[in-house]
């Protein structure tokens, strides 16, 4: 040990004087360190001149030993327990569904500081580099814990909103579009698509079907024969793992189909059975509404009762039309068109039936003696006859013959009657055609028909006019 402390005065003397230092190979320390073979020492031994000009480095340390020494230094550091606690919290937040909050780590820091102060332990070591390393590691894990907390909050928010959306849009009651406790509620074991009267008419057959544990599927030929009502639905898993919905059918005559499942039978998939049944029900309920020009019976009964109660003035006001539309579940246009057609086809035949028959005949006979210049002035008729080569139809006194005048007006009368016929046909569809004429135009058409009847000398029935006497 005395020889190990001697190089310091030797280096000082070497710096002040030019005296060469003693040879190192003769010292026992050099011989002891030269025993393990190393590359650096071989260079110094082979070149004594180089060793004399440069200082000899210290002996190298094994990397594994250096690593173990660094580990021991980290383990002995005062901040290592805090670093370990933070690392465990990050592991728990990563593995489990419940994330450790950053507030809990703040509490742990306060507890650690109080404990260190009570035990009078330092927070740092004598190595500043190691202290800086420990502080940086704690900061990195702290940031990592904050990021894990944010990710966990986002995941929880997404899951909650997704579950709420599924409950809202994919609930069975919303799919069936019916209230809870209705005939199509999923709580009931059977789905009833026919009226209660049909089920009451065949109680024996229905009781036998409801107790059948296995459902029956009706072949395609049975569906093409007529109306079919589904009475019970039982889930069944067939080969391949697919879930189907076997259905027991009841025809419109009340007969229960009890055939076995044949080849090519219709199978209703479980995921689509609710929507298919609902669409079938909606189509059957709205079948009559889709027919053009046919109003519901209860609506026509309400409007007909109002019409008979106001025979003296069968013209409802706008407020009354709105009230009737609300009662009948119709539009204002449908209500207005119905009353227009009802005044023509219901009230007018009643008035005609109440009047005696000789009155129209007398009116027609009287109309033949009207002066002809109302429709065809003498000047116009005489000019037309002269252009045709004379006036063969004129009387000796210069007046116009009535037969010739009526023959001239036959074409125009026919056209007028055809127009009136087309207008009446357009109004035959109740509640579907738009209202293209008001009450004043109605009265003008009636006057036009009366004038045409007055001009016609032939029977009106020869024109083949057909009028509908019923109002749907």
UniProtKB/Swiss-Prot annotation:
GO cellular component: actin cytoskeleton; cytoplasm; intercellular bridge; microtubule cytoskeleton; nucleoplasm
Compartment list: Nucleus
Renumbered residue ranges of the record's region Disordered: 1-62, 351-371, 386-405, 422-472
Acidic residues bias (residue ranges): 429-454
Protein name: Homeobox protein PKNOX2
Keyword Nucleus included in the entry's annotation: yes
Biased composition (Low complexity): 46-56
Keywords from the named record: DNA-binding, Homeobox, Nucleus
Domain of life: Eukaryota
Molecular function as annotated in GO: actin filament binding; actin monomer binding; RNA polymerase II transcription regulatory region sequence-specific DNA binding; sequence-specific double-stranded DNA binding
GO BP terms in the entry: regulation of transcription by RNA polymerase II
Keyword Repressor on entry: no
Biased composition (Polar residues): 26-38
CDD domains from the UniProt entry: homeodomain
Organism: Homo sapiens (Human)
InterPro entries: HD, Homeodomain-like_sf, KN_HD, PKNOX/Meis_N, TALE_homeobox
Family as reported in the entry's similarity comment: Belongs to the TALE/MEIS homeobox family.
Every MEIS N-terminal domain range: 96-179
Basic residues bias locations: 361-371
Ranges annotated as DNA-binding: 291-350
Recorded name of the encoding gene: PKNOX2
């Amino acid at each position: 040990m005395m020889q190990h402390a001697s190089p310091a005065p030797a280096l000082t003397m070497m710096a002040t004087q030019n005296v060469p230092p003693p040879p190192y190979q003769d010292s026992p320390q050099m011989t002891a360190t030269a025993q393990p073979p190393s590359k650096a020492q071989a260079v110094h031994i082979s070149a004594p001149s180089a060793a004399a000009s440069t200082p000899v480095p210290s002996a190298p340390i094994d990397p594994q030993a250096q690593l173990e020494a660094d580990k021991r230094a980290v383990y002995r550091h005062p901040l290592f327990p805090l670093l370990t606690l933070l690392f465990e919290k990050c592991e728990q937040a990563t593995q489990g569904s419940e994330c450790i909050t950053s507030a809990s780590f703040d509490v742990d820091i306060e507890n650690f500081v109080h404990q260190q102060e009570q035990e009078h332990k330092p927070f740092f070591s004598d190595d500043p580099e190691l202290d800086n390393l420990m502080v940086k590691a704690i900061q990195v894990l702290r940031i990592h814990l904050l990021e894990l907390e944010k990710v966990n909050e986002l995941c929880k928010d997404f899951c909650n909103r997704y579950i709420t959306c599924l409950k809202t849009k994919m609930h069975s009651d919303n799919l069936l579009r019916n209230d809870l406790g209705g005939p199509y509620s999923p709580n009931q074991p059977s789905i009833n698509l026919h009226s209660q009267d049909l089920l009451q008419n065949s109680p024996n057959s229905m009781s036998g079907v409801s107790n059948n544990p296995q459902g029956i599927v009706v072949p395609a030929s049975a569906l093409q024969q007529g109306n079919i009502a589904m009475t019970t639905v039982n889930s069944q898993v067939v080969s391949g793992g697919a879930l189907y919905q076997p259905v027991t059918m009841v025809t419109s005559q009340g007969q229960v189909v009890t055939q076995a499942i044949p080849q090519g039978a219709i199978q209703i998939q479980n995921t689509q059975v609710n929507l298919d049944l609902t669409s079938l029900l909606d189509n059957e309920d709205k079948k009559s509404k889709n027919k053009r020009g046919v109003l519901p019976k209860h609506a026509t009964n309400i409007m007909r009762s109002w019409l008979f109660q106001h025979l003296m003035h069968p013209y409802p006001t706008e407020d009354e039309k709105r009230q009737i539309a609300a009662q009948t579940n119709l539009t204002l246009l449908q209500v207005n068109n119905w009353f227009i057609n009802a005044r023509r086809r219901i009230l007018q035949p009643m008035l005609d039936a109440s009047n005696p028959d000789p009155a129209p005949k007398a009116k027609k006979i009287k109309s033949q003696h009207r002066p002809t210049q109302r429709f065809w002035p003498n000047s116009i008729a005489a000019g037309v006859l002269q252009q045709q080569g004379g006036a063969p139809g004129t009387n000796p006194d210069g007046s116009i013959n009535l037969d010739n005048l009526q023959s001239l007006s036959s074409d125009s009368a026919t056209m007028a009657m055809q127009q009136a016929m087309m207008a009446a046909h357009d109004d035959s569809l109740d509640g579907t055609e738009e209202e293209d004429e008001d009450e004043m135009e109605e009265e003008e058409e009636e006057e036009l028909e009366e004038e045409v009847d007055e001009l016609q000398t032939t029977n009106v029935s020869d024109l083949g006019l057909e009028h509908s006497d019923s109002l749907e």
